[in-house]
């Protein structure tokens, strides 16, 4: 039985404080269940499973069942999984588990599990210990750089294992967001040549050009990235540096690019895009928008969490409000309509018209 606080403000705030302190338990438990294959086993089971059955399905020793049960009952209390106790006739009830709706985001083809595995990896997560020193230092070094001695993307080139986790996380997250973009955004209508700046190996453009057969895709990234890009129908790969020049097109696509940079660098990027656009061209940027007011609701909390990730990872990187993006558009010479279209999970499509 869970005791009630009975209107005791002191107890209510203390419980809230403890909740914040113990928050780390949730993602670390989630990571363990993903790594052990428990959530895959649960979502693939087709029926309610006991901890013993889940342990067996995940090929864990029988002795692990008790620990499995303890992890899953925590997740049940958070509505990640569902729990239904079964009466055993006077003995301790046996809990049977089924996946809750949110569980599908941690298993299967559209899983966000790779994102969790990257963010909770020791080589990444431990960099957050340097956040106080980075904030107090005032020397332009973010926590990640203080911890690893070099900027994040440079470090990724030295840690193949972590880089693989990062790439898997970005591919899965982009697949989800771009899939929703293609369902809900009409801004690609009428586009002939679409340039994806920072497009990686072309996976995003492949999704877009598969839907819009009339679009010729130009995938633009650094030479070492383009060197790994596969041949794709309807997509041309070009190597270069966006701070120097951008290939010509009537639309330029920027997916989660601007939040990596400070305002000065964003202006440089957007001006190079402006120069490369046709007369009536536009930039389509997919970004998270910060709410104007930090309200205590998930739709506001998640953008502010992402902003903290930028603060930890990249010097000058940050999430922005819609007015801040509109201001950047004006400063870069985009005199046409600026508009924001909501896509999915805090992501927006921003159109900067020339």
From Swiss-Prot:
Broadest EC class? transferase
Under the heading Gene3D superfamilies, the entry gives: Vaccinia Virus protein VP39, Winged helix-like DNA-binding domain superfamily/Winged helix DNA-binding domain
The record ties this protein, via InterPro entries, to: COMT-like (IPR016461), O_MeTrfase_dom (IPR001077), Plant_O-MeTrfase_dimerisation (IPR012967), SAM-dependent_MTases_sf (IPR029063), WH-like_DNA-bd_sf (IPR036388), WH_DNA-bd_sf (IPR036390)
Pfam families this protein is in?
Dimerisation (PF08100), Methyltransf_2 (PF00891)
Named from the GO MF annotations, one term is:
protein dimerization activity
Which residues are annotated as active site? 259 (proton acceptor), 287, 319
Sorted UniProt keywords: Methyltransferase, S-adenosyl-L-methionine, Transferase
Give a yes or no for keyword Methyltransferase in this entry.
Answer: yes
Set out the biological process GO terms recorded for this chain's protein: biosynthetic process; methylation
According to the UniProt entry, what is the EC number of this protein?
2.1.1.-
Query: CDD domains per the record?
Result: AdoMet_MTases
Concerning what turns on (or off) its expression, the entry says: Induced by UV-C.
Name the domain of life this protein comes from.
Answer: Eukaryota
Q: Which amino acids does the record list as binding S-adenosyl-L-homocysteine?
A: 198, 221, 242, 255
The UniProt similarity line reads:
Belongs to the class I-like SAM-binding methyltransferase superfamily. Cation-independent O-methyltransferase family. COMT subfamily.
Name of the protein in its database record: Caffeate O-methyltransferase-like protein 2
**Which source organism does the UniProt entry give?**
Oryza sativa subsp. japonica (Rice)
């Amino acid at each position: 039985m869970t005791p009630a606080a009975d209107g005791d403000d002191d107890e209510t705030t203390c419980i809230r404080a403890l909740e914040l302190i113990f928050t780390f338990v949730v993602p670390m438990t989630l990571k363990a269940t993903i790594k052990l294959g428990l959530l895959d086993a649960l979502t693939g089971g087709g029926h309610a499973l006991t901890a013993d059955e889940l342990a067996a399905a995940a090929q864990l020793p029988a002795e692990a069942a008790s620990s499995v049960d303890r992890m899953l009952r925590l997740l049940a209390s958070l509505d990640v999984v569902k729990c239904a106790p079964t009466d055993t006739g006077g003995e301790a009830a046996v809990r049977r588990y089924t996946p809750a709706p949110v569980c599908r985001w941690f298993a299967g083809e559209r899983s966000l599990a790779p994102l969790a595995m990257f963010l909770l990896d020791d080589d990444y997560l431990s960099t957050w210990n340097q956040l106080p020193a980075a904030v107090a230092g005032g020397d332009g070094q973010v926590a990640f750089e203080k911890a690893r001695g070099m900027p994040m993307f440079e470090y990724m080139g030295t840690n193949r294992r972590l880089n693989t986790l990062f790439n898997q996380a970005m591919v899965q997250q982009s697949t989800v967001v771009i899939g929703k973009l293609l369902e809900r955004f009409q801004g690609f209508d009428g586009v002939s040549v679409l340039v994806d700046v920072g497009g990686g190996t072309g996976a995003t453009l492949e999704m877009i050009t598969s839907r819009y057969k009339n679009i010729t895709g130009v995938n633009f990234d650094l030479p070492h990235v383009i060197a790994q890009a596969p041949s794709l129908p309807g997509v041309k790969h070009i190597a270069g540096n966006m701070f120097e020049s951008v290939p010509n097109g009537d639309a330029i696509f920027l997916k989660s690019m601007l939040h990596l940079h400070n305002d000065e660098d964003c202006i440089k990027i957007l001006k190079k895009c402006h120069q490369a656009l046709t007369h009536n061209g536009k930039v389509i940027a997919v970004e998270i928008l910060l709410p104007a007011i930090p309200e205590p609701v998930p739709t506001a909390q998640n953008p502010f969490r992402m902003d903290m990730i930028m603060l930890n990872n990249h010097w000058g990187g940050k999430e922005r409000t819609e007015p801040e993006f509109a201001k950047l558009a004006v400063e870069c010479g985009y005199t046409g309509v600026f508009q924001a279209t909501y896509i999915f999970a805090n992501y927006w499509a921003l159109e900067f018209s020339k």
